[in-house]
Amino acid sequence: ILLLVPTSYFIYHWISEETISDITPGTLGGELILSDGKSFNLSDNNLPENAVRAFVIDSKGINYQIPANKPQVKEIQNILRTLQGMECLITLSDGTRVHLNAETRLTYPVCFSSKERIVQIEGEAYFDVAPDKEHPFIVKTSHTSIRVTGTSFNVRAYADEDTESTTLISGTVRINSGNEEFELVPNQHYTYNKNTGTN
């Protein structure tokens, strides 16, 4: 279903700020799960950092800062999981900013090194994607694939809900739900029904 809809509170709260990175101190909360299975609470101060896990954590969230002179490495996947009542902002290695709503799980590479920038999400998040026409950004949910080059949009895909939805704020996105593909324009809303397999 494609609809023109008012902006939800979650989206409006973040795009109405002077900048998306202005997160109020104290809202940071969640768990970082590294590729080796080790997990850390974001409030801890003893998080590891090495050549392929170069990040800074502060009151604004997680900011990946991969040095330009580091050799290209295979894509190592980390997971950021927010807890109930918590939110978190993460800046990925390409500069894309993702604001995770409560009870959301984002799987992403520490450093994008392939032709496509691919992340996976379960829950709800607002994406402000860094433009890069040569390396499309793809967000995968359990039932859809959202392809962009540089744009802002919201994805809601909680496992315990009957639908998945995408709301486009700016730019364009293409959504693939199996045999069908849709292109959204700003302020357009896409919904996929998991029970019926229909859009």
PLM-predicted stretches and their roles:
Residues 164:
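Conserved active-site beta-strand-loop modules that form the wall/rim of enzyme catalytic pockets
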Residues 2-161, 174-197:
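Short acidic/polar, Gly/Pro-enriched loop/turn segments located at secondary-structure boundaries
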Residues 167-168:
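Propeptide (latency) domains of metzincin metalloproteases
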